[in-house]
Amino acid sequence: MKPLEELLQQTEFSDDDIVRLLGLTTPEDCLALKRAAYKKTTDVMGDRVFFRGLIEVSNICTANCRYCGIRKDNHDVKRYEMTEDEIVGQAVWAAENGYGSVCLQAGERRDAKFIDFITRCLKRIHAETVSEELPDGVGITLSLGDQEKTTFETWAQASGNRRNLRYLSRFESSNPDLFKLLHTAPGKNQKNLEHRFQCFRWLKECGYQLGTGVMIGIPGQTLEDLCRDIRLFQKLDVDMIGMGPYLKSDGGDLKELGQMDPKALMQLSLNMIAVVRLVLGDVNIAAATALQAIRDDGREIGIEYGANVVMPNLSPQRFRAGYQLYDNKPCLNDEPTQCGDCLEKRIASRGRRVGWNMMGSSRHYRTRTGQTAQEAIPESTAQRDALNEKALRGPQGQRRIFFNTVAV
């Protein structure tokens, strides 16, 4: 067998290589994997970590995905929908406080009222976030489930800036049996993996940056399944990846299957992040909030293993308890103003820095679409200080206090 250090120097990996790396468990081997992935990240993507301010628009959902705490048939959840003013207000706050982009997430709905509601929000967010720092307005990621192509196109037009428009829709598992386990409740509406892939094709045709991902540690999942997931990422030619550990939900109907031992699940999730970074290289990878549900510093460790995106929760505190896809979701009692400050400190502790006022589009997307010019990254200390100073000032120019101690 090839020495691990030699394997980690490769630029191409066989399926056997991937399975071997995913299965690493000893502290020494995992440290070597982490170092290789961290180096790959900073060499290819730079040292910045990009924020996607998460706005959990609504927990009303028409789907019955069996793993999910806000599934339609969970009648213990108090349903809510933020108002248009609340959603736009949070997006404007994000733009004024240095966030380059926001993510609107909600349960899946395809009714005309919801589609029009999101359309109005997108138009207003674009119009109300254009500024000197963000001349195209704040970047937008949507995570609103499977939709028709006409809906994707309507939302793309409403966004005002397709170049900085993203859509996140995870296929959860490339194994049809596992996908069925997660999404098909007896006698209920059924999800179809092929239709999910059709949505991906429509999204690209409409000009979105495509984001997808999987659950890690699904009951019955194998390392070979995860390897096939990685190969599917390549085949789909995705721009960003959001994946995290499978965590049971008391609101779902799979809780009797349990979940992996937390320590083992954490390491497998980190290994998956690292291997995806080594294999795909130039995509954006999010450090999932679910990692923090296992360990308080889970997202920071995810950054060490190859992630370069985090999603601070900007949802008003009063809504957070109603949007729990899994048990023990962190930060339920925090307000949006606490998240950015806290995360910047955590990111700095791992030798990285926040990309304030930057869209943070992946290098893969820019290459795929022929955009040779990379988003401007200030090189001198003076330029960096000037950019940070802009991010530190709120709408009336008052200075916000952040923790900025990363060496440059």
Give a label for each model feature.
Residues 29-50:
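Short, charged low-complexity linear segments at domain edges
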